[in-house]
């Protein structure tokens, strides 16, 4: 049996290639895109404006490639964590986060992660594979709450800019008129600062950027994030300063606050100096305890003092509300290591 190729995750140019393969005119690519991304069909047979014989040819080699989540967990705060298969013995998690005025989906880009951040369960899992554009988009398209989505954040499992080619295909489909036609303002890509991918993102994308920072001091950041050695925060920030964030595109810096480690006003002062000249936001995030890691979260009074100091210095700073901690869906808690036995 020949493995079929998935149409979900193909760009318009790729769909033109599919049309050519089965003897359809080039304009049929737009018809297929409408069916896949706007009508969200799950079977090629539903493409009723394409001739039956041509649909049969398509079905010989292709499938839509949309598949429902394998399981889910719902938090007491309404957050829902979904598990998706991503190949034999491989799984990823995504998180649906509804609030009063928006509904955000936190999407994964890799099975596991190479970055091995001290505070992150995904990093403890290690890296298995990059997700394909199909596997990334399926988390969005097959979400039961898809119609309610207002925002997408690439802050799930993996480092998005370490899977940059598939990421850019997904961003194109999400924002292009032939695809979802979303505004880039509704999409945020998070990164630890993979330089090559970041440069491409800054040059080619209008989506928002979030940078995992967590300390203004190189050696301290290195103790938390081994990637500081390859991608120093100072170099990442110097690169960002070369681009314009004064209009619709935003940059934010993510800062998990650890007790007696990076929560002092000295840190806040150093952070304000490091970020000087960038119109940005700092998001303070409570550390969510994970197994075999001795770090603790800072107390709320210290976080509020840190926030107030930065705001007084002209750096917009907020404390992000934690969601889904009781189901291990909060920041730094995603992991599918436990699922690999269920093949």
UniProtKB/Swiss-Prot annotation:
Cell compartments where the protein resides: Cytoplasm
Q: Which residue range or ranges hold the Radical SAM core domain?
A: 99-320
Q: Which residues bind S-adenosyl-L-methionine?
A: 158-159, 190, 212-214, 288
Here the disulfide bonds are 106-331
Tell me the GO BP annotations in alphabetical order.
Answer: rRNA base methylation; tRNA methylation
**Group of enzyme by EC:** transferase
Reaction it catalyzes:
adenosine(2503) in 23S rRNA + 2 reduced [2Fe-2S]-[ferredoxin] + 2 S-adenosyl-L-methionine = 2-methyladenosine(2503) in 23S rRNA + 5'-deoxyadenosine + L-methionine + 2 oxidized [2Fe-2S]-[ferredoxin] + S-adenosyl-L-homocysteine; adenosine(37) in tRNA + 2 reduced [2Fe-2S]-[ferredoxin] + 2 S-adenosyl-L-methionine = 2-methyladenosine(37) in tRNA + 5'-deoxyadenosine + L-methionine + 2 oxidized [2Fe-2S]-[ferredoxin] + S-adenosyl-L-homocysteine
Q: Entry's InterPro entries? A: Aldolase_TIM, Methyltransferase_A, RlmN_N, RNA_MTrfase_RlmN, rRNA_lsu_MTrfase_RlmN/Cfr, rSAM
Cofactor(s) for this UniProt protein: [4Fe-4S] cluster
Q: Which UniProt keywords apply?
A: 4Fe-4S, Cytoplasm, Disulfide bond, Iron, Iron-sulfur, Metal-binding, Methyltransferase, rRNA processing, S-adenosyl-L-methionine, Transferase, tRNA processing
Its Gene Ontology molecular function terms? 4 iron, 4 sulfur cluster binding; metal ion binding; rRNA (adenine(2503)-C2-)-methyltransferase activity; rRNA binding; tRNA (adenine(37)-C2)-methyltransferase activity; tRNA binding
Q: Which branch of life, at top level?
A: Bacteria
**The record's free-text note on cofactor binding:** Binds 1 [4Fe-4S] cluster. The cluster is coordinated with 3 cysteines and an exchangeable S-adenosyl-L-methionine.
| The protein's Enzyme Commission number | 2.1.1.192
Q: Name one GO cellular component term.
A: cytoplasm
Q: Name one Pfam family in it.
A: Radical_SAM
Binding positions for [4Fe-4S] cluster per the UniProt entry = 113, 117, 120
**Catalytic residues identified in the record:** 93, 331
Family per similarity comment? Belongs to the radical SAM superfamily. RlmN family.
Summary of the function given for this chain in its UniProt record: Specifically methylates position 2 of adenine 2503 in 23S rRNA and position 2 of adenine 37 in tRNAs.
Q: What else is known?
A: Reaction proceeds by a ping-pong mechanism involving intermediate methylation of a conserved cysteine residue.
HAMAP family under this entry?
Answer: RNA_methyltr_RlmN
Identification of the protein by name: Probable dual-specificity RNA methyltransferase RlmN
Give the species.
Parabacteroides distasonis (strain ATCC 8503 / DSM 20701 / CIP 104284 / JCM 5825 / NCTC 11152)
**What gene, per UniProt, encodes this protein?**
rlmN
